[in-house]
Design a protein with these regions (language model features):
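An N-terminal hydrophobic leader/cap segment in hydrolases
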Residues: 2-50, 60
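Alpha/beta-hydrolase active-site loop
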Residues: 84, 115-136
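Conserved alpha/beta-hydrolase
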Residues: 91-111
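Alpha/beta-hydrolase fold nucleophile elbow
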Residues: 137-149
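Hydrolase active-site cap/lid region
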Residues: 157-209, 267, 272
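Short beta-strand/loop motif that positions the catalytic acidic residue
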Residues: 222-223, 229-231, 235
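Conserved alpha/beta-hydrolase "acid-adjacent" motif
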Residues: 236-242
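Catalytic active-site module of serine/aspartate enzymes centered on a nucleophile-bearing elbow/loop
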Residues: 270-286
Length: 286
């Protein structure tokens, strides 16, 4: 394919994606169906609470046993839902932890919005943590957050702005939104030197944040609680090198890296390989 044709097709694609309707489609993923706690034999309370912009979030809450006790918010990735992370709920609850499985805006059963983004995931996570700490079954001094993919990056961002978490866990988190977007642009064969940089600036304006201000490699050194980076060595979407980059940027923060050999980006069958290291970390931190 000639360079001229690549540019022409890229321009047509950009016109579709970056028009207001295209941006809404791009940043409002289709909602993933899933199972419920009942189907897995978990007794969960169906709850909802407010987030920003007058929206409401849906979640499943499993109280700690015994209560009051420690508890964690679990946040899914892009285009996923709380249902996708239900396999983590059982081992967490067996360890005596309360679990709040959250649907971010535009995902699962939560309210829609004009778009979703990693900073909005972090906003929703903040509201979920505040709701969790107010529950009488929860010890508010022993709370943590676990996130996958975009949710993992949101955990790092939220944890960098809070001083009331005992632990944070980011599974398959990307190190920098720009790196993630460049990989995405490459998949569409959009030439970065010619058009890609403009796309990234346009998206920054659309979401209201500069990538450098919200990147994990920028904010990780501000985290005041222990952070676990769990990452599959065979992740095809967010390379393992991203986890190493976050670790290298940690400064004085307490950060541990848990490589999961042979694990991809988040296949359910890989959860058993994540659980031992996750539970060891949480038992020490909480």
């Amino acid at each position: 394919m000639t360079t001229g044709l690549v540019i022409l097709l890229s321009l047509l694609l950009l016109a579709a994606l970056l028009a207001p309707a295209g941006l809404r489609r791009l940043f409002r993923p289709s909602r993933a169906p899933g199972t419920s706690p009942d189907e897995l034999g978990l007794a969960a309370e169906d709850v909802s609470f407010a987030t920003v912009r007058g929206k409401r979030l849906s979640a499943w809450f499993i109280a700690p046993d015994p209560a009051p006790g420690p508890a964690v918010v679990v946040l899914h990735g892009w285009g996923s839902s709380a249902a996708e992370l239900l396999p983590l709920a059982a081992p967490l609850h067996r360890a005596g932890l309360g679990v709040l499985l959250l649907d971010a805006r535009c995902h699962g059963r939560s309210d829609d919005d004009d778009f979703a983004s990693m900073p909005r995931f972090a906003e929703d996570l903040d509201h979920a943590l505040d709701w969790l700490k107010a529950r009488p079954e929860v010890d508010p001094t022993r709370t943590a957050a676990i996130g996958h993919s975009v949710g993992g990056a949101a955990v790092i961002l939220a944890a960098s702005r809070r001083d009331d978490l005992r632990a944070a866990v980011a599974v398959a988190a990307f190190a920098h939104p720009r790196w993630m977007m460049r990989r995405w642009l490459g998949a569409f064969r959009i030439p970065y030197p010619i058009l890609g940089w403009w796309v990234l600036r346009h998206v920054e304006r659309a979401i209201g944040h500069r990538y450098d201000d919200i990147a994990a490699v920028t904010v990780v050194d501000r985290i005041r609680c222990p952070l676990l980076l769990a990452h599959g060595t065979d992740d095809p979407q967010v390379p393992f090198a991203d986890a190493r980059a976050i670790l290298a940027a940690r400064g004085g923060a307490s950060v541990e890296l848990l490589p999961i050999d042979g694990f991809g980006h988040g296949e359910p069958e890989g959860v058993p390989r994540l659980v031992p290291g996750l539970m060891d970390f949480l038992s020490r931190a909480l």
